């Protein structure tokens, strides 16, 4: 059945109740409304550490891990995307998977969300997680995540975990607040069987934007406006490839961007072979930026 619950987060203050249904395979489902899961406690400002845990494409070009960006503020730790290789990448870089409080997903392709079945399984059996995890993504998240879990580990989505799994499906240009992270989704030009997004994430007074996978679209200018850091996918050097961005397109539009810092990521083999000749800062696995 359905129940109104008042989630308690680490702030301990009053929180906005939201409608949720228990009874589904994934514990608690929340529908995004502005102000969702918002804490009233004052929060510290910065520093915010952005770590490119995985900066690679879907094919592991040059041995890079698939997309996974970790964000650490003074009192929180969460991921943006969690590609299939992310659990290995986190452990290799000395990060405890059970520390992850939230995962924000740009889109539902395996190199961006395929690590979730492993992260959730780890929480149940290896890390012995007890704290809730909130997963935020596009419409279709609940169905696709359940399918992925069942294909990889049959029965895993039906086991009642020792921790709450909270799913939040978000819509474009409708900012929501989860704990004290404000996230806004912008439409991306990328087919993934569900809406694909660029994500603007504001936490501890800093703004980080990740393009997700997308062809060049001027929406990227809107999404990244005045951001402290904009991580932009740069799959190819100068070809026009459907669904993906290129270094040439980014450079054509660089002067129109108002972000304070730009880093390119999600590069294919050809792009990586030319990374020494580009005029932009490039991500690599383990690269850390302090905002």
Task: Show where each model-derived region lies.
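Binuclear metal-dependent hydrolase catalytic cores
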Residues: 3-5, 17, 30, 36-209, ...
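Residue-level detector of intrinsically disordered/flexible regions characterized by low predicted structural confidence
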Residues: 7, 27, 40, 212, ...
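Residue-level detector of alpha-helical segments with a strong bias toward transmembrane helices
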Residues: 11, 64, 91, 222-223, ...
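Short hydrophobic alpha-helical segments enriched in small aliphatic residues
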Residues: 10-11, 16
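Intrinsically disordered, glycine-rich low-complexity segments
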Residues: 12, 22-29
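Cap/insert and terminal regions of metallo-dependent hydrolase folds
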Residues: 215-291
């Amino acid at each position: 059945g359905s129940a109104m619950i008042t989630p308690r987060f680490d702030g301990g203050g009053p929180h906005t109740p939201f409608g949720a249904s228990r009874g589904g395979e994934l514990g608690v489902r929340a529908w995004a409304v502005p102000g969702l899961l918002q804490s009233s406690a004052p929060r510290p400002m910065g520093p915010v550490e952005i770590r490119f845990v995985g900066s690679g494409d879907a094919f592991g070009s040059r041995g890079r891990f698939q997309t996974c960006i970790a964000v650490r503020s003074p009192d929180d730790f969460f991921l943006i995307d969690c590609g299939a290789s992310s659990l290995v990448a986190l452990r290799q870089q000395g990060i405890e998977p059970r520390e992850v409080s939230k995962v924000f997903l740009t889109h539902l392709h395996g190199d961006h969300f395929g690590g979730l079945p492993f992260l959730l399984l780890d929480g149940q059996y290896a890390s012995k997680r007890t704290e809730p995890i909130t997963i935020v993504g596009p419409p279709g998240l609940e169905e696709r995540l359940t399918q992925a879990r069942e294909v990889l580990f049959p029965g895993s989505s039906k086991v009642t975990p020792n921790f709450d799994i909270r799913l939040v499906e978000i819509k474009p240009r409708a900012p929501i607040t989860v704990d004290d992270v404000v996230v806004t989704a912008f439409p991306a030009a990328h087919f993934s069987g569900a809406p694909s997004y660029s994500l603007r994430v504001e936490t501890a007074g800093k703004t980080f934007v990740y393009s997700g996978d997308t062809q060049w679209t001027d929406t990227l200018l809107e999404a990244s406006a005045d951001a402290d850091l904009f991580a932009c996918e740069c799959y190819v050097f100068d070809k026009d490839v459907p669904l993906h961005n290129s270094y040439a397109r980014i450079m054509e539009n660089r002067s129109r961007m108002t972000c304070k810092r730009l880093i390119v990521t999600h590069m294919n083999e050809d792009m990586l072979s030319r990374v020494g000749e580009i005029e932009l800062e490039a991500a690599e696995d383990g690269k850390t930026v302090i905002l």
